[in-house]
Amino acid sequence: MLFNLLVILGPTASGKTRLGVELARRFFGEVLSADSRQVYRGMDIGTGKDLSEYGEVPYHLIDIVDPGYEFNVFEFQRRFEQAYNHITERGKLPVMVGGTGMYLESVLKGYRLVEVPENAQLRRQLAGFSHEALMERLGNANPRLHNSTDLLDHHRLVRAIEIAEYEAPPQAPFLPGLSPLIFGIQWDRPILRQRITERLKLRLDQGMIQEVERLHDTGIPFETLEFYGLEYRFIARHLKGELSRNDMFQKLNSAIHDFAKRQCTWFSRMERHGTVIHWLDGAADPLAEALGILSHQKTQSTPFCRP
């Protein structure tokens, strides 16, 4: 099999970054992050960037926009394509690492996404709709590509409907010739739960609460921070006095466990729809296992892929 993209996916706290960086180091590769939150500058501990692990390995799609900027899957796909072409033109191997299923699939499925323009007529039509009616309309549209947070905010919900009902003109295929080799890291559930809890304790010790305070001090409202993921949501509520530190920890820990389950469900759905994932045992030696699989594979000749 020829491949021109390595992919490392898995639930949170599974060890994706470490494996992805080590494979990139051994195969003269560069990492492309597929994480919807690591794009934001200043959100380091809460998003688990772990930049110290990269060393000399170049990385892309991390720290590229400021908090407050509405980054989405459409822009991710556009920037991924630019970075991918830049990497392959220099004869390097792209290594995509991440756990945001929507971002991963926007690359692996090969469909080109388009930025949907605002529809003033539709917005006027939806202006009088209740939140429940908007949710029902979005559900009827059966969209594949909207964030779960869209259901929490009225403006985002209207935008999600706008995207779901948009009829896009024909587009050129996304990265024709893309041939990914996909690894997934899996753990027994009790061990993964333990890893999540231990990592949360470590991040709090590293200053995650202070990170949220600094972001708020720069002018980002707590209400906005709540949309940047579980860590920022529960810590913001703690800083507002709505949760004690212990309650914040317990609720956040439980929410991250639930999030990991949803990630695994997403990956299972990807497999049911034809995505081939080579699962590695996180508790054993995932690097050695990956190298064993790679020894039977071949990369395409340089450049790996030039659309």
UniProtKB/Swiss-Prot annotation:
Residues reported in the UniProt entry to bind ATP: 10-17
Residues carrying the site annotation Interaction with substrate tRNA: 100
Cofactor or coenzyme needed: Mg(2+)
Binding site residues for substrate: 12-17
GO biological process: one example: tRNA modification
EC number: 2.5.1.75
Keywords recorded for this protein, A-Z: ATP-binding, Magnesium, Nucleotide-binding, Transferase, tRNA processing
Origin: domain of life: Bacteria
Record-linked InterPro entries: Dimethylallyltransferase, IPT, P-loop_NTPase
Annotated region (Interaction with substrate tRNA), positions in chain: 35-38
One function term, GO molecular function aspect: ATP binding
Keyword tRNA processing: yes
Catalytic reactions on record: adenosine(37) in tRNA + dimethylallyl diphosphate = N(6)-dimethylallyladenosine(37) in tRNA + diphosphate
Family as reported in the entry's similarity comment: Belongs to the IPP transferase family.
Function recorded in the entry: Catalyzes the transfer of a dimethylallyl group onto the adenine at position 37 in tRNAs that read codons beginning with uridine, leading to the formation of N6-(dimethylallyl)adenosine (i(6)A).
Subunit structure: Monomer.
Name of this protein: tRNA dimethylallyltransferase 1
